[in-house]
Amino acid sequence: MVPVIALVGRPNVGKSTMFNRLTKTRDAIVGDLSGLTRDRQYGDATWQGRSFILIDTGGITGDEVGMDEKMAEQSLMAIEEADYVLFLVDARAGMTAADQMIAEHLRKRNKSAILVANKIDNIDPDVARAEFSPMGMGNAIPVAGSQGRGINALMEAVLGHLPRDAEDEALDQEVAEGEEAVRIPGPSEKDGIKIAIIGRPNVGKSTLVNRMLGEERVVVYDEPGTTRDSIYIPFERDGEKYTFIDTAGVRKRGKIHEEVEKFSVVKTLQAIKDANVVIFVMDAREGVVDHDLNLLGFALEAGRAIVIALNKWDGMEPGERAYVKTELERRLFFVDFADIHFISALHGTGVGNLYKSVQAAFKSAVTRWPTSRLTQILEDAVSEHQPPLVNGRRIKLRYAHLGGANPPLIVIHGNQTESIPKSYSRYLENTYRRVLKLVGTPIRIEYKGGENPFEGKKNTLTDRQVNKKRRLMSHHKKAEKKRRDKR
């Protein structure tokens, strides 16, 4: 399971700055979900190949009233959701009563935490550590979040405390043995294709899970984890193995009440990261709302294959259906590669077709193509539409190879690749998608420059070359002297 890290502390100690730096600001952020995650933002972050979910919270002072009280409650909830806590304090302001209160709360909850002394600009780190030592949280790690100072040391400490899964250990073993570390995930014999059913509350996720499992389902086990873990439900259909990653909690047939289904952002984000394919469920009667876009954006940034299911399609008038389809085209243009199904989970209409799209999306996400195939597609694309000129020189793209899967990562080598415009990258992405007939999965393209490895370096001559150079110079001097003497 993907670990969850919460940033907590008083207001204005630099939590949001730290959040933006660790998520690199370009990663998907799922936050500001009204009534559920006010002043909690969720981001997908990766450090040294290790992925985790980061939670940014509002400040805690201990004397909140009104809206501030609600914000503080959300921060305390984030602590409960997290596997690990980064407790930020302000090195300039020194230790406060609010800092001590938060430290006491973390001790009571028995939470694993690291004390982070932020804003150490022009402050002696040893002085900062001594200032906060009375709180009993161990030695503070000094950082300057706005400048990035100390972040590497902080993350080294954090990663040392986070659990490692089998995939991380296998990757480390490959690196230790000198193998190329490219993850190409596939369905294990035990799990099959892992499918996450995600969506807002009350869109019919529970009903869809049970409808897809069916009356004749083969469930090996229902194994609930901790209160933060999802439920993994292995089953078979037509000889194919699947595993549902269900975020709606334990349920029994006939006892599902959609109106009380609990929604957990953390469960959903963890399910997305752990899945091969995401089935994104929407309520056709409500159309596309901002919450849908937030969650769908996170699935896209995580690189997961996506299938969209528009539930509660039955009973809608033709005019309503036409309007919803228009809205889908307008607002979901960024996932136009995903299959869309119009279903009724309650009555089973169209549900069976989801499996075909799941298999197609998974196949597209994990298929391995040889370098020769990817390079030929690149050459054909460049021949049809050349890259632009940069300072009078044409960008050259030489060859391409597969760098990873789920999502497919195509690595393209060439020169001046840092100057390739986004429009040309989209052209290449669309070309690969069309030629390889990819459906249901995003594609990522990464460029590698072809810098001259000898640029700026002097050649070191061998002894033989030095002697030869001396002989040539001596011969040249003698010949020059003879020409002068003849004159």
From Swiss-Prot:
Residues 449-487 are annotated as: Disordered. Residues 449-461 have a biased composition (Basic and acidic residues). Residues 467-487 have a biased composition (Basic residues). GTP 2 binds at residues 199-206, 246-250, 311-314. Keywords: GTP-binding, Nucleotide-binding, Repeat, Ribosome biogenesis. Residues 3-166, 193-366 form the EngA-type G domain. Residues 367-451 form the KH-like domain. GO terms for molecular function: GTP binding; ribosome binding. Associates with the 50S ribosomal subunit. GTPase that plays an essential role in the late steps of ribosome biogenesis. Belongs to the TRAFAC class TrmE-Era-EngA-EngB-Septin-like GTPase superfamily. EngA (Der) GTPase family. This is GTPase Der. It comes from Pseudomonas putida (strain GB-1). The gene is der.
